[in-house]
Swiss-Prot record:
It comes from Escherichia coli O7:K1 (strain IAI39 / ExPEC). The active site is at 237, 266, 285 (proton donor). It is found in: Cytoplasm. The keyword Transport does not apply. NCBIfam families: PRK15409.1. Catalyzes the NADPH-dependent reduction of glyoxylate and hydroxypyruvate into glycolate and glycerate, respectively. Transmembrane segments: none annotated. InterPro entries: D-isomer_2-hydroxyacid_DH, D-isomer_2_OHA_DH_cat_dom, D-isomer_DH_CS, D-isomer_DH_NAD-bd, Glyo/OHPyrv_Rdtase_B, NAD(P)-bd_dom_sf. This is Glyoxylate/hydroxypyruvate reductase B. Homodimer. One of its GO terms (cellular component) is plasma membrane. Its EC number is 1.1.1.79, 1.1.1.81. It is an enzyme of class 1 (oxidoreductase). Pfam families: 2-Hacid_dh, 2-Hacid_dh_C.
Amino acid sequence: MKPSVILYKALPDDLLQRLQEHFTVHQVANLSPQTVEQNAAIFAEAEGLLGSNENVDAVLLEKMPKLRATSTISVGYDNFDVDALTARKILLMHTPTVLTETVADTLMALVLSTARRVVEVAERVKAGEWTASIGPDWYGTDVHHKTLGIVGMGRIGMALAQRAHFGFNMPILYNARRHHKEAEERFNARYCDLDTLLQESDFVCLILPLTDETHHLFGAEQFAKMKSSAIFINAGRGPVVDENALIAALQKGEIHAAGLDVFEQEPLSVDSPLLSMANVVAVPHIGSATHETRYGMAACAVDNLIDALQGKVEKNCVNPHVAD
């Protein structure tokens, strides 16, 4: 008899078929308490869980006594109670490598669109404001040869550094938990403390996961240390930034502009002051949102669940010691 798994995110037909070759698949719309209650028998028997954008906490796990592995279609897993999963010896799988290049593209797009004011001036053209040769009030700022500061030199940070160094001749500063020899050798990147990075960078790109240590890592103190001409980019996790402090820094002119793919609360409220600022490019968490990459992430998540329930956790496992 095939193991039972619960799928709470739609999959392309071919990936669903692959999942069904290995498991009895039960599809649900979400992991809300109502859904769990209505499908209590299915949740009680499930050995696997696959999906994204839903919280998996101790309350849910109490309803799933046979759960052995959960696979998320994402690299981030701050919506999972890792301690609760680990305590119950449940494997947590994620997709850390598939989206690297695409998210780096998004970061570079935010750098370019904020510096050159692409969104703002495009809207002015649509509004009929382009009636003569443009003047300085339409101008942006250069990207090439400007200093890029990267906070978090992981896979995505490396991919961004590659684009910035080779494509735009940008000097690279970085701050991370440890020195990154490859970044220093390939891109001539310079390791520095966070204060130095903030003071010297023309662009500050934040690429950090959300943890207890990184929550509100960026606040009023950090923005005050940046150049008034600096542009802030966040494509990591929204709560790493104190959003009210960011808004204040933009309003006071402490920083020049911001390109944001993530926010403290998502979706972003239509009443957010960020949406009324011409110098803010706000996009709806599109970091990995291409057809090709989202398919690749889903395929990876399917393979991860198959591997996990077969006892193979050599890669893409957040808590591999559970399998020991």
